[in-house]
């Protein structure tokens, strides 16, 4: 209940607006370190796990895909719960989303190109359609109408959660045969991928001398990915039942682990630098 109410609160207060990008000017070090961690740690971990577990090629590509995606709203919710730097979290999510049309296809071409054919331009176009166009429309809507359609502010988190649940059901049904044969191994890989993302994200920031609040923030930004985007890309590739499996498993798990970590951190006041 605490997590769902926080999600609604963060959505209403942090629905993407032009203000979210001011953090690039106010916190350039945190944004730069966060982006570097975001687009190195998880893609490399994904490639390593896909190779180590020797998954079928399209399943392996799905693991790399979820690792190569930007963070999503869930990381903002967890940062809020964990008393982390919510402003940095929102800015990182916004900037990572905007650079995703270049970074995600580049990482997929580089790391997953040996598993499945990757069309850079087609994937870039897909990401524009799935994320960038809705984000731009959301920015415009938020600028002109935020607070004027309160029923929409309340409805959107519910609609989003219902939509995600429906998509996961479709992927699970479509990938039933693969799930029965490698499901447990894929769940294990998703858990390792996610947990190591938190660990490397947190300690990577520690190495650069970031404060505790910022380290917590970037741990969530790195460990929690935009499963909806990864699923959309898999659908556009026509491989929802294979490439889409890893994002479908990673998404629910990251919310469980993220909530647990956020609750644990919530009771521990961030140490001052």
Task: Place the predicted regions along the sequence by residue.
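Entry/N-cap segments of selected transmembrane alpha helices
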Residues: 20-50, 60, 98, 125-126, ...
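Single conserved hydrophobic/aromatic residue that forms the stacking wall/gate
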Residues: 1-7, 11
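Helix-helix packing/entry segments at the starts of transmembrane helices
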Residues: 153-155, 210-234
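C-terminal ends of transmembrane helices
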Residues: 14-23, 73-84, 139-150, 201-209, ...
